[in-house]
């Protein structure tokens, strides 16, 4: 388990107020920040830090990137889009969101229009 700490008291003055990530499984300490004596990302064995007092510092795991997520919200009825495909002259100002951009529905190709309708309306999540 990894724990974040700030050293508040130590025999080694270089450790005062430094921030570390302690990995108890590997018995390693990674320096996050120190005024002097240690470099950022320097790794030492925990016992090399000697005797010290510390306070816990909350750490936040970096988000995992698993591929893009994108949500376009269009507040329309399916019938409206289907009617716009059949009668584009009735909907010259119909604007929808596609890939983060606002676009006139009638400017899309028929294939793109069908794709928008298929992706916009679902029976369940």
Swiss-Prot record:
InterPro entries: Auton_GlycylRad_Cofactor, Form_AcTrfase_GR_CS, Gly_radical, Glycyl_radical_cofactor_GrcA. Keywords: Organic radical. Pfam families: Gly_radical. Acts as a radical domain for damaged PFL and possibly other radical proteins. GO terms for molecular function: formate C-acetyltransferase activity. This is Autonomous glycyl radical cofactor. PANTHER family: FORMATE ACETYLTRANSFERASE, FORMATE ACETYLTRANSFERASE 1. The lineage of its organism: Bacteria, Pseudomonadati, Pseudomonadota, Gammaproteobacteria, Vibrionales. GO terms for cellular component: cytosol. It comes from the Bacteria. The modification Glycine radical is found at residue 100. Residues 5-125 form the Glycine radical domain. It comes from Vibrio vulnificus (strain YJ016). Gene3D superfamilies: 3.20.70.20.
